[in-house]
Amino acid sequence: MKLSEISDNPGARKKRMRIGRGIGSGKGKTGGRGGKGQTARSGVRIKGFEGGQMPLHRRLPKRGFNNIFRLEFSEINLDRLQDAIDAKTIDASAVINAESLVAAGVLRRSRDGVRLLGRGELKSKLTIEVHGATKSAIEAVEKAGGSVKILAPKEDKGEAA
């Protein structure tokens, strides 16, 4: 057996059917779409339509609401902070806040503030000013000899009433 003699098994590669190419092709005229009407046209499916049966999105009750005053915080974990300190993108001796994290490229944007989360280990002594922090994050920073200052969230996005 030579490399040039290797071939596929018979029927392993099936030629694709070209539709709408004459009656003799076996997929001509209607092209496998049946008769006329809505389903024969392109872009056929009506989303959520169940043939007249009450659709699922109308059978289920409405729930909840969108709070327009909801605050969205950018989250940062301790391990990410430690990596930035090790890479020398953040100065551990300076006060770390939302602006310094964005300037260093650790966060893309600070949204309504920054929330510190406790995943990972912190070796450096830090002074951090954030808008929120978990108990485990505060404990880890204080254990490393640092301090966490919780700031008030940024000003309300909505108009004054």
From Swiss-Prot:
Which cysteines link up through disulfide bonds?
none
Q: Matching PROSITE patterns, A to Z?
A: RIBOSOMAL_L15
Keywords (A to Z) from UniProt: Ribonucleoprotein, Ribosomal protein, RNA-binding, rRNA-binding
Choose any GO biological process term that the UniProt entry carries and state it.
translation
Give the GO cellular component terms, alphabetically.
cytosolic large ribosomal subunit
| Molecular function per GO | rRNA binding; structural constituent of ribosome
Task: Give the highest taxon in the source lineage.
Answer: Bacteria
Biased-composition ranges for Gly residues? 21-37
Q: Annotated region Disordered: where?
A: 1-43
Spell out the coiled coil positions from the record. Answer: none
- PANTHER family cross-referenced by the UniProt entry: 50S RIBOSOMAL PROTEIN L15 (PTHR12934), LARGE RIBOSOMAL SUBUNIT PROTEIN UL15M (PTHR12934:SF11)
Q: What does this protein do?
A: Binds to the 23S rRNA.
* Complexes and interactors: Part of the 50S ribosomal subunit.
| Family as reported in the entry's similarity comment | Belongs to the universal ribosomal protein uL15 family.
* Protein name (database record): Large ribosomal subunit protein uL15
Per the UniProt record, the source organism is: Rhodopseudomonas palustris (strain BisB5)
Q: Which gene encodes it?
A: rplO
